[in-house]
Amino acid sequence: MGITMDEEVIFETPRELISIKRIKDIPRSKDTHVFAACITSDGYPLIGARRTSFAFQAILSQQNSDSIFRVSTKLLRFMYYNELREIFRRLRKGSINNIDPHFEELILLGGKLDKKESIKDCLRRELKEESDERITVKEFGNVILKLTTRDKLFNKVYIGYCMACFINQSLEDLSHTSIYNVEIRKIKSLNDCINDDKYEYLSYIYNMLVNSK
């Protein structure tokens, strides 16, 4: 089943409210963020696992000079185990319970558009950087989705644009190599993330981009 132009589909997770809408063109501005729904040469959808969780990054950005972390307990389930250990090390009162050792901050690969780049050139550059130059693009799809995400924990709204990207590498080519990119710690198959809160809407995005005409 496809999605018609300007039709809006809504997904909600414990943390996010996501609006997905098919559009004709990606606007070009200094704040435009573009993402690739990557498909391997053997047909697997790819997703990135971020090196640092968004929750922990937000805490670090608000850290004061006396090195005290003030942390809402609502954020704890959205952090990596090593980040929780760092918080626990500085804890003066309270406790940390119900830690999920399997948490991963899943993201679509991509980034911010440079004003001198085309959309596709931006995605080629970002994929090259985030994969330590392991990913090369075979072709892009023609369908464009606008993704509007409201982060309910921080009450912020993020807008991005996504298109399918068919790459030359197989899943095997990418799954057994270490990545040293500052932002991405791992590239993996979305099919391995069925228990993640984001899996449902990420799967929908891939299906729409690959199967829509």
UniProtKB/Swiss-Prot annotation:
Induction (record text): Expressed in the early phase of the viral replicative cycle.
Segments forming domain Nudix hydrolase: 30-209
Cofactor(s) this protein requires: Mg(2+); Mn(2+)
Residue positions of motif Nudix box: 111-132
Catalytic residues identified in the record: 126 (nucleophile)
Any GO molecular function: hydrolase activity
InterPro entries xrefs: NUDIX_hydrolase-like_dom_sf (IPR015797), NUDIX_hydrolase_dom (IPR000086), Viral_VD9 (IPR003300)
EC class name: hydrolase
Catalytic activity: a 5'-end (N(7)-methyl 5'-triphosphoguanosine)-guanosine in mRNA + H2O = a 5'-end phospho-guanosine in mRNA + N(7)-methyl-GDP + 2 H(+)
Binding site for Mg(2+): 126, 130, 183
Keywords: Hydrolase, Magnesium, Manganese, Metal-binding
Residues engaged in binding N(7)-methyl-GTP: 16, 50, 151
EC number: 3.1.3.-
Family as reported in the entry's similarity comment: Belongs to the Nudix hydrolase family.
Function: Decapping enzyme that remove the protective 5'-cap from both host and viral mRNAs to commit transcripts for decay by the cellular exonuclease XRN1. Accelerates viral and cellular mRNA turnover to eliminate competing host mRNAs and allow stage-specific synthesis of viral proteins. Acceleration of the turnover of cellular transcripts may even promote the shutoff of host protein synthesis.
Protein name as annotated: mRNA-decapping protein OPG121
Species per Swiss-Prot/TrEMBL record: Vaccinia virus (strain Western Reserve) (VACV)
